[in-house]
Structure formats: structure tokens, C-alpha cells
Amino acid sequence: MIVMDGSMGNELLTRRSDLVTGLWSAQYLIDAPELVKEIHLDYINAGADLIITNTYSTIPSYLSKQNAEDKMPELIHLAGKLAREAVEDSKKKVIVAGSLPPLEESYRPDLVINKKEAVPIYETLIKELTPYVDIFICETMSSIKEMQHVIQALSLIHI
């Protein structure tokens, strides 16, 4: 049995509600990265065998709300690094999963973007997270089409 961590976004909001912007949980990577790492550690210390990177909102649909699309690779990289550091600091054997989120709203298959737009975004997520993660998780995807975009990106990277 593997126990996965819980919500990162809700924990961030509970601990520091002053940082809420259109970037959602990505804002904390900019303004409070130590808090992101602390939450990963808290989940590990609570018994999680697997933690998920804080990359759910490090995608253009969120970043564009604050004109921060250019920060995408940097934020993804930082999110992976913080998760891996939390595992190393814990000195426990914990799996790090790279979050590959839906690229528009969760649970809205009608909003899934086309492959030509989606695959490069997933390629960036995968490339930046690969040094830090053990596995990838297609998080809250609402259609097979979204997962196929991830599979296409993975096949192009050859990891």
C-alpha cells in the first residue's frame, strides 16, 4: 500500500492566505517557497509515502493571469527541487510524483486544448521535473484526450 499526500493548495491557503492571486499555488513558489517545502515535509512526517510536486498551476492558463508565462520553466524546476529536497531532508524513502495537470479547468473535457498547443506545455513540465521525480501523475484529467497529450510529450522526450 502507498499513501499519497493531500492537498497542497488548501494547505498553502490555510497557512498564508495573503498570497492568493490568479497564479493560485504557483504564487507560493515565487513568494514562499520555504512554505511549499514545509508542507511537503509535514505530509511526509504525517506518513505519506508519495508526495506530488506543486506544479498544478505552473501552466500558461494560470500564469497568463499575471503575465508570468515566461516564469513557467523556472517555477516547474523549483517545484520539483523543493519536493526532492523535502524527501532528502526527511531521510525517509518517499516517492516524488510530478504533477501533470489539466491545461484548462479541472473536470471540463469540453475545454481540453488541441494537441499542437498541449504537447509543448507537457514537454516543458516533463523536462523540468524529470531530474527530481520518480513518476508522473496525470492529475484530475477529465478525458483520455488529455492523457494522450501527456503520452505524446513523453514519447518525444525519451526519458
Regions found by a protein language model. Name each.
Residues M1-D31, Y56-L63, K92-E117:
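N-terminal small/glycine-rich loop or linker at the start of catalytic domains
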Residues G6, Y43, A83, F136:
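Conserved, mostly hydrophobic/aromatic
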Residues I44, L129-T130:
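Non-catalytic positions within long, well-ordered alpha-helices that form the structural scaffold/packing
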Residues L50, M72-I76, G80-E128:
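Active-site beta->alpha loop and helix N-cap motifs at the rims of alpha/beta catalytic domains
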